[in-house]
């Protein structure tokens, strides 16, 4: 019997504590979309610059690298578990840097996914390269793939075109890194900005959709999903980050805060009412988690 770590009153935001591979084996459910921000394996004692200070880039024990073989095996295992939980027409997004993204892309292909795009998130405010011996690391990569090569996926082409001044949306997104107001409940070392997750969710899901994040962290995926009228299941091992996620979700239960955060995300302004739903407005809201 699975007991949620936290569930919001409207049941649109649920958190589980544990290993995603083990937990996903324990229930039958199919998600419309998965976003995953797995370990990048870049914690190697390096340094970077933050707010004018030299800081270590290490994120934690969970982010320390192994051998190429062990990294491939790790990615193969969790991606296979996630594939089993995708609907036939579902898609998955996986973010990374050069440290892990090539392994991820190879494992996706190996497992039968069809890669649709590799989005480059070009950060408009990256930290400087203090060694001055190579180019500044100013981008992350997000692989978008569908479960099956033969089953069509959902893509909100018209909305993405509206967001991009009437032109087809490209695969290079110039968006800033996380803003200070997004850290109001605390800080996660790998927290993604709501602007990135909002675009991903609007592009690849319909209102009322179920979104899974197997490495939830501070649950930016879940906050973006709920701001956009989608539902969310997040899994993480770390109690500290689950409490941070819970606090972030409770923060937007305040109507004024909910509206303020929606107002700060540019892409939401382009979304018509048909792109955003609320609990009870769509019959798909009757499709619930089995715990």
Task: Give names to the regions the model predicted.
Residues 1-244, 287-291:
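Core catalytic lobe of class I
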Residues 244-291:
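PRPP-dependent phosphoribosyltransferase catalytic core
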């Amino acid at each position: 019997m699975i007991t949620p770590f936290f569930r919001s009153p409207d049941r649109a935001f649920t958190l589980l504590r544990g290993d995603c591979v083990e937990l996903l084996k324990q229930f039958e459910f199919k998600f419309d979309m998965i976003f995953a921000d797995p370990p990048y394996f870049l914690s190697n004692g390096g340094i970077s610059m933050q707010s004018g200070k030299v800081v270590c880039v290490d994120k934690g024990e969970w982010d320390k690298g192994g051998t190429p073989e062990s990294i491939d095996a790790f990615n193969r295992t969790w991606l296979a578990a996630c594939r089993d939980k995708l609907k036939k027409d579902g898609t998955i997004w996986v973010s990374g840097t050069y440290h892990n993204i090539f392994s991820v892309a190879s494992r996706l292909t190996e497992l039968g996914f069809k890669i649709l795009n590799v989005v480059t998130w070009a950060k408009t405010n990256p930290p400087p390269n203090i060694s001055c011996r190579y180019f500044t690391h100013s981008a992350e990569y997000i692989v978008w793939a569908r479960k099956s090569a033969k089953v069509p996926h959902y893509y909100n082409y018209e909305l993405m075109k509206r967001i991009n001044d009437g032109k087809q949306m490209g695969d290079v997104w110039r968006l800033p890194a996380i803003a200070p107001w997004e850290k109001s409940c605390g800080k996660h070392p790998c927290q993604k900005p709501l602007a990135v997750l909002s675009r991903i969710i609007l592009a690849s899901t319909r209102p009322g959709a179920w979104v899974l994040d197997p490495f939830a962290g501070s649950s930016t995926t879940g906050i973006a999903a709920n701001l956009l009228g989608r539902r969310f299941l997040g899994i993480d091992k770390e109690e500290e980050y689950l409490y941070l996620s819970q606090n972030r979700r409770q923060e937007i239960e305040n109507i004024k805060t909910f509206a303020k955060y929606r107002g700060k995300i540019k892409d939401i302004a382009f979304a018509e009412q048909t792109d955003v739903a609320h609990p009870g407005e769509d019959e798909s809201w009757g499709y619930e988690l089995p715990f």
